Design a protein with these regions (language model features):
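Multi-pass alpha-helical transmembrane bundles in non-GPCR membrane proteins
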Residues: 1-223
């Protein structure tokens, strides 16, 4: 093991962000237990699988972010980890849609929307993988558009879910959209003076807020 590689593994690149993402990952793992236990009492395999996809997408995002903010091996590896971090956002959005489409809707509308959302996620991942200089605003535009695909089935969702559940779904979407706009516009303007707390970190704070809202929705109204 070279000295540079050893230093990159043993020295944390961004301690603050690495710690907060690690805590979020642990909380997501813990949160999986009551969610899946509740679903397991009265639900079938498809019901449990849909919720498992949601919780695994959340854990995967925070795990990828933890690794990205922890390791500092080389510019090439850092770029790869950053891309994976960004790709996992597509997985999280699609993973959040999965229980809504499979359980709340559960009909042709739900399966059509599920196919559309995962299709967009795959396209977004390929764009991030192949377009080396993909600008933040473009990725953010896809994130936000993907997050609001549910508008296409808004009437069906409202009729299939209690109003309180829909409000949690809506709150998560609004919080996520606000974070996406901040990320796309590279806000706040003090980025250059705050090395470890810029638009990327603020975006992830909003993502955690979105995760919390949607977890509450899943636990109370879907599981």
């Amino acid at each position: 093991m070279t000295a540079k590689l050893k230093r990159g593994i043993t020295k944390v690149k961004d301690p603050g962000s690495a710690l907060t993402h690690f805590i979020a990952m642990i909380l997501a793992i813990i949160a999986a237990i009551p969610l899946l236990s509740k679903a397991g009492h009265d639900s079938g395999h498809m019901h449990i699988s849909a919720l498992a996809i949601f919780i695994l997408s959340m854990i995967g995002l925070y795990a990828a972010s933890t690794i990205y903010h922890t390791l500092d091996i080389s510019p090439k590896i850092n770029k790869l980890l950053r891309k994976i971090d960004h790709m996992m956002i597509f997985i999280l959005i699609a993973g959040t849609y999965t229980p809504v489409c499979m359980i709340v809707l559960g009909d042709k509308t739900g399966w059509t929307m599920l196919t559309l959302v995962w299709g967009i996620a795959i396209v977004g991942i390929l764009i991030n993988a192949l377009w080396i200089t993909c600008p933040k605003w473009f990725s953010s535009l896809i994130y936000i558009a993907m997050g609001w695909v549910c508008i296409l089935a808004i009437t069906k969702i409202l009729s299939s879910m209690p109003r309180a559940g829909f409000m949690w779904l809506l709150a998560g979407g609004i919080i996520y959209t606000a974070g996406g706009i901040i990320y796309a516009m590279k806000l706040p303007f003090f980025n250059s003076r705050h090395r470890y707390f810029g638009s990327h970190e603020i975006f992830h704070l909003f993502v955690r807020g979105e995760s919390l809202c949607h977890y509450v929705m899943m636990y109370r109204f879907v599981a």
